[in-house]
């Protein structure tokens, strides 16, 4: 694919008087994993709907697989696989039948569809569940089946909306391994997620959006360096405000969330020396991570 598989240019979308996507621009390169991050209500779901032609932008331009959207969205979707946030597998069919039935939407012959099933089941590690009904599968198995179904048409682009929500750690890591194998095969992936570790592990670049606007973009490690650029000490105690008054001189920046004081430090030694041996206090010294970036950009307060 010579052109950008996904391209947004100054896109806007309103619902009534509310501007939910506000001049959003980003472009995804061939073969990269690009993450959309943002708090609830930031406009991520609306962005995906517009990308797939399920909602029309009020301004700006969108292209998917080189096709203008929404005018050629149906044609573009023939080259796209989608993993929705919530599984929409058919509970009346077996694992094998879910794949076979879905292949009909792409006009495949029965012979071609049957030839696809075995390698897709192997990819999803569901070979032993081919004849099981969906209701017999664990949550992780259902997500892997949904991913396998998204690959029926051998898509150039995969769009994944929070693909590991609700999975236990083992199932999540297996899903990550499967996604990395797709990237190694040259697939292009657009992913939304609330798991910062997931974004940091999988994504080549990230776009952080808030209130429909892009507020940061870059590689995970670059964002961590530019937005934080130091270590973090988390201090747990009964009076974080008093602790901040006492310790802020030893930190580059401080934040409070609940009973936790976050101290961003260039040199941790002076601060940790004041904490050692103090009853009722616990602390953790760690490198900065993507969650620190996200919370610095969007705030630590809960957003609905």
Swiss-Prot record:
Record-listed ATP binding positions: 38-45
Superkingdom per UniProt: Bacteria
Membrane topology: Peripheral membrane protein
Enzyme class: translocase
GO MF entries: ATP binding; ATP hydrolysis activity; transmembrane transporter activity
Keyword Membrane on entry: yes
Disulfide bonds: none
Entry's localization field: Cell inner membrane
Keywords carried by this UniProt record: ATP-binding, Cell inner membrane, Cell membrane, Membrane, Nodulation, Nucleotide-binding, Translocase, Transport
The enzyme's E.C. designation: 7.6.2.-
PROSITE patterns: ABC_TRANSPORTER_1, ABC_TRANSPORTER_2, NODI
A Pfam family that the UniProt record links to this protein: ABC_tran
Similarity comment text for this entry: Belongs to the ABC transporter superfamily. Lipooligosaccharide exporter (TC 3.A.1.102) family.
Known function: Part of the ABC transporter complex NodIJ involved in the export of the nodulation factors (Nod factors), the bacterial signal molecules that induce symbiosis and subsequent nodulation induction. Nod factors are LCO (lipo-chitin oligosaccharide), a modified beta-1,4-linked N-acetylglucosamine oligosaccharide. This subunit is responsible for energy coupling to the transport system.
Identification of the protein by name: Nod factor export ATP-binding protein I
Organism for this UniProt entry: Burkholderia orbicola (strain AU 1054)
Lineage of the species this protein comes from: Bacteria, Pseudomonadati, Pseudomonadota, Betaproteobacteria, Burkholderiales
Gene: nodI
């Amino acid at each position: 694919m010579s052109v950008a598989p996904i391209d947004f240019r100054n896109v806007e979308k309103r619902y009534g008087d509310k501007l939910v996507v506000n001049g959003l621009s980003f472009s995804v390169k061939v073969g990269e994993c690009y993450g959309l991050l943002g708090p609830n209500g930031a406009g991520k779901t609306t962005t995906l709907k517009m990308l797939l032609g399920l909602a029309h932008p009020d301004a700006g331009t969108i292209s998917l697989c080189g096709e203008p959207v929404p005018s050629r969205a149906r044609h573009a979707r023939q080259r796209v696989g989608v993993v929705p946030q919530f599984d929409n597998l058919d509970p009346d069919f077996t694992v094998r039948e879910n794949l076979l039935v879905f292949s009909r939407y792409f006009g495949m012959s029965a012979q071609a569809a049957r030839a696809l099933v075995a390698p897709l089941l192997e990819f999803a590690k569901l070979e032993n569940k081919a004849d099981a009904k969906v209701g017999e599968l664990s949550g992780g198995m259902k997500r892997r089946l949904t991913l396998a179904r998204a690959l029926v048409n051998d898509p150039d682009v995969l769009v994944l909306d929070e693909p590991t929500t609700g999975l236990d750690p083992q199932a999540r890591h297996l899903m990550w391994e499967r996604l990395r194998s797709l990237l190694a095969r040259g697939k292009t992936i657009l992913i939304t997620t609330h798991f910062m570790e997931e974004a940091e592990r999988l994504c080549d670049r990230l776009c952080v959006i808030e209130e429909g606007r892009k507020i940061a973009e870059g590689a995970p490690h670059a964002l961590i360096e530019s937005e934080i650029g130091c270590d973090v000490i988390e201090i747990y105690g009964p009076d974080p405000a008093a602790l901040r008054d006492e310790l802020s001189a030893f930190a580059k920046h401080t934040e409070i969330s609940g009973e936790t004081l976050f101290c961003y430090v260039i040199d941790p030694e002076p601060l940790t020396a004041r904490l050692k041996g103090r009853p009722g206090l616990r602390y953790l010294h760690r490198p900065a991570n993507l969650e620190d970036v996200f919370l610095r950009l969007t705030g630590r307060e809960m957003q609905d």
